[in-house]
Amino acid sequence: MIRRYLYTFLLVMTLAGCKDKDLLKGLDQEQANEVIAVLQMHNIEANKIDSGKLGYSITVAEPDFTAAVYWIKTYQLPPRPRVEIAQMFPADSLVSSPRAEKARLYSAIEQRLEQSLQTMEGVLSARVHISYDIDAGENGRPPKPVHLSALAVYERGSPLAHQISDIKRFLKNSFADVDYDNISVVLSERSDAQLQAPGTPVKRNSFATSWIVLIILLSVMSAGFGVWYYKNHYARNKKGITADDKAKSSNE
């Protein structure tokens, strides 16, 4: 009987632990903290779990999983580490070709411009692409003009939609030798968030409900164990008394 209660207890504990779903894994502490901050900003409770060498993982309640994935995609999380130009060309690296160095340099510039655009108020995510002539200067050929394009997703109701000229001016002053007409900026307003899965009601108190069920089950188990113990203990005592009475009768 005790074994049956033990199995039931373990089953309930397992089901209670399955309420959270893994959202992200293998994050460093800074990435995990930023993900937690964004989710909490949108009223989604998230847990950060330290997995040692495997990094940090983020879990959320199952009813919040759909909304959490939406906000992660919207904010392009987890964030990429900040790029420093010096990191692209370490002093102890092997000598690479001029083309490879140019490609790495422009890639770093793209990422730095993206990070700068994301600091603007209302910008949720940004992408910058540079079209450059990789063969410029070879065989005396004149370089082709550089083109810049930027795509930014902004928060609904943000005044960023009227600041395309400011963004173009920022890109123009951040990059040498690029004409203003060769810069294109596309702004996209964030779509409406689907905060719950279709047909699935949101259950904010699922964790508390699990604990209530667990407490009730433990109470029932304790009562059952008390009844079982009382019956067995009473039966043994009764048998002992009967045996003693029989022994006394035989001695007499």
UniProtKB/Swiss-Prot annotation:
The keyword Transport applies. The chain crosses the membrane at residues 207-227. Residues 1-17 form the signal peptide. GO terms for biological process: protein secretion. It is found in: Cell outer membrane. PROSITE patterns: PROKAR_LIPOPROTEIN (PS51257). Required for invasion of epithelial cells. Could be involved in protein secretion. Belongs to the YscJ lipoprotein family. This is Lipoprotein PrgK. It comes from Salmonella typhimurium (strain LT2 / SGSC1412 / ATCC 700720). The lineage of its organism: Bacteria, Pseudomonadati, Pseudomonadota, Gammaproteobacteria, Enterobacterales. The gene is prgK.
